[in-house]
Amino acid sequence: HIQGTAYGSMDDGATIIELMNEAGYDVATLGNHEFDYGMARAKAVIKEADFPYVSCNWVDLRTGLRVLPAVKLFPAGGKWIAFVGITTPESFTKSTPAYFMNAKQTKYIYDILGGDDGRKLYDAVQKAIDKAKTLGADIIIGLGHLGVDPSSSPWTSEEVIANTTGFDAFIDGHSHTVMENKQVYDAAGKAVTLTQTGSYLANVGKMTIAEDGAITTELISTADVSDAAVAATAEAWINDVDAMLGEQIATTDIKFYINDPATSKRRIRMGETNLGDFVADGIYTYFNEVEQLDCDIAMMNGGGIRTDVDAGKWTFKTCKQVSPFGNVACLMSVTGKQIQDALEFAARFAGEGGKENGGFLHVAG
């Protein structure tokens, strides 16, 4: 939640946390992008928040202890509601592995428990659920950043539910999926409500727990309400960023897209788009024409290309919105076999009826 656009990344998420504080958040968990600015910044974000963070599977390997509490309980309607925080083990690869290492980068000192078969993740989650029960929880809700993309297997929210018992509902993120209500069966055959709001606050999720424990969910896409303090903070920061990055640097006659123009569904993670081509062309041109180096092929993963761009002027902010993560382009010598392996691995979910994969490669050369 502190990444994704220029408004998040220009101050390493500080204003986003300020807005969350003013909005009155009660609890949050960490996703992979909370680590994008380094481990020290991730910990600072937690301290800046007026609300607690929970994660049952972020571990300090030097002590063997969790970095954060696994569970947070709240009283409501005469019952205790527990939230179990779960962070995607993909944080290692979808953030920066070095951030989880010691200063000399000789060994890992932090882990996001996952396991190649998912068992470490499932065990950590089950222990947290059991802990919530011992603390007196009447309702237990998973608060995860796991997603449902096949490329995230075996760490998807659906797999976590299927390999544990005790959840009553699960609020998910990571895959940017719009999912109002899906029933997923846990290891004991109990139906668990799984929900996800999509991305960029296109929806706000509403979960209602009835007196008898029945759970219903709703996705709210529009609301005629505003908080003056939150709106003022947001407007001031938007104006600051627009001023910093507002200089025009180019003009285009066409729309560049990450979403399929025919269906409006995101395509950048499963197939070619003109913006994916353009970004890869830009990397290729940079190395060959700006740095005067011998670059044969350029590759860029679709997960790092984040927004459509309408025809018209391009500013520095446009570039920051397209590629907000501050990734560094690298030039290396590889074999033809390595290139083939990379392309095949990137396209393993593509094709007819393909599934999203942030590692899908866009190429130039």
Name each region found by the language model.
Residues 1-226, 270, 274-285, 295-298, ...:
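Acidic, metal/ion-coordinating pockets
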Residues 231-365:
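Non-catalytic terminal accessory segments
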